[in-house]
C-alpha cells in the first residue's frame, strides 16, 4: 500500500519470496486471511500456500529487535500485528479526512465505497474511524 508497497514481487512476507512484512501479513497472522482459501501460487516455485510461519517468524524477530532498541519487554507477535494494523487503518482514515473533513465535509452521512484487493479487509474499520455507518463492497472490488 502506498509508495513503499511490497508490490506483487516479491510481495508480502507471506508470499514466501523474501518480501517484507506488510499489512497483508498482519491480516494473515491475525487469521483474517485464511491460506486454505487461496490457491497455492506462492513461494519460490509458485506452488505453495500463503506462509503463516514465515510471517510469525518475522514478527517475532521484529518484536525482539524493537525490545532491544527500546529496552522494553518484548511484545508478542499478535499484539505487534494488531498494533501495525491499527496504525494502517488510521493512516487510511486520515487520508480521507485530509480530502474531506479538513475541507468542511461531514462524511458521517456518506457511504464508504471500497475497491482494490484489500479494500474489503479494511473498509469497515476505516468507516468506523470516520463515523461512517454504511459501507459498500462491490462484488468486483478486487478488480476495480
Walk through the language-model features, giving the residues of each.
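N-terminally biased helix-coil "hinge/interface" segments that flank
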Residues: 1-144
Amino acid at each position: 500500500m502506498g509508495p513503499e508497497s511490497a508490490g506483487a514481487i516479491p510481495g508480502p512476507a507471506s508470499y514466501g519470496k523474501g518480501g517484507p512484512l506488510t499489512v497483508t501479513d498482519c491480516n494473515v497472522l491475525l487469521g483474517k486471511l485464511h491460506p486454505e482459501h487461496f490457491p497455492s501460487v506462492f513461494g519460490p516455485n509458485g506452488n505453495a500456500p500463503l506462509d503463516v510461519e514465515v510471517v510469525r517468524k518475522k514478527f517475532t524477530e521484529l518484536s525482539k529487535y524493537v525490545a532491544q532498541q527500546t529496552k522494553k519487554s518484548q511484545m508478542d507477535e499478535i499484539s505487534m500485528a494488531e498494533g501495525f494494523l491499527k496504525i494502517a487503518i488510521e493512516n487510511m482514515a486520515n487520508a480521507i479526512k485530509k480530502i474531506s473533513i479538513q475541507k468542511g465535509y461531514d462524511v458521517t452521512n456518506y457511504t464508504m465505497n471500497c475497491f482494490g484487493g484489500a479494500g474489503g479487509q479494511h473498509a469497515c474499520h476505516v468507516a468506523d474511524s470516520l463515523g461512517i455507518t454504511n459501507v459498500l463492497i462491490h462484488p468486483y472490488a478486487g478488480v476495480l
